[in-house]
Amino acid sequence: VDCGQVNSSLASCIPFLTGGVASPSASCCAGVQNLKTLAPTSADRRAACECIKAAAARFPTIKQDAASSLPKKCGVDINIPISKTTNCQAIN
């Protein structure tokens, strides 16, 4: 998994993640779906998680509740927590 792909998948989610808008855009949700496609294995999900953590650290205004609700709001069942504090190595 390449962090550039992960970052570009989630870039359109920044307005939602920082609380600028109340719900994620269609392009944001398409990115979440794409992220699921990019990470089919446990190792891929752990790598994607590390990318997400690194990206989240660059955006101190990301709201944790928005981040954790993103997959559900998009209707995507993804096994990668979107958080600044996830222990990525614990992901299966």
From Swiss-Prot:
Keyword Transport recorded: yes
GO terms under biological process: lipid transport
GO molecular function, one term: lipid binding
Keyword Ion transport: no
Sorted UniProt keywords: Disulfide bond, Lipid-binding, Transport
CDD domains, sorted: nsLTP1
Pfam families in the cross-refs: Tryp_alpha_amyl
Alphabetized SMART domains for the sequence: AAI (SM00499)
Disulfide bond sites: C3-C51, C13-C28, C29-C74, C49-C88
Family: Belongs to the plant LTP family.
Role played: Plant non-specific lipid-transfer proteins transfer phospholipids as well as galactolipids across membranes. May play a role in wax or cutin deposition in the cell walls of expanding epidermal cells and certain secretory tissues.
Name of this chain's protein: Non-specific lipid-transfer protein A
Organism expressing this protein natively: Ricinus communis (Castor bean)
Phylogenetic placement of the source organism: Eukaryota, Viridiplantae, Streptophyta, Embryophyta, Tracheophyta
